[in-house]
Amino acid sequence: MTIDVYDNVLPEIDSQLIDKIMSDREFYWQYYHRSNSEEEIYHWFRMAGRTKVEIENNGFEWLLPFWDHLMNKYDLEEKYGVEQFRRIYFNAHTYGVEPRPHRDDGDFTMMYYPLLSWRKDWGGGTIIWNEDTSEVEKHVAYTGNRLVVFPAK
């Protein structure tokens, strides 16, 4: 399984803008998202959209230049066969909200860590399990302005 970790993926001014937006108390989160599991999984979630038009209509047009930047900078089409996003959404886990192991749908998962002031002693990050979930394939620590790309299944 190929797990790619890229640091400092956006220019500093852009990463600061995203950090500010995501840290804003006015950013509206929903507390529940079924994901692709039959099991109810509670965590903070916000759907940006499944198409460019939907993303614009939902007020997240600021995401589209960042997507284009990542597509070009990391040649996502050549490296991963990604021609377009399937959907863009936000997940968040706060203290006491524990994530559950799950399999993502689609071909690839791309996760961007936006918070620049994240402290290592808070923990966090992403655990990627092997196929039968018996062993941890990789733990990716949370570092602001980091992109993690791995096969979704």
Where are these regions (language model features)?
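Non-heme Fe(II)/2-oxoglutarate
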Residues: 1-81
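Catalytic core of non-heme Fe(II) oxygenases with the double-stranded beta-helix
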Residues: 57-60, 64, 68-153
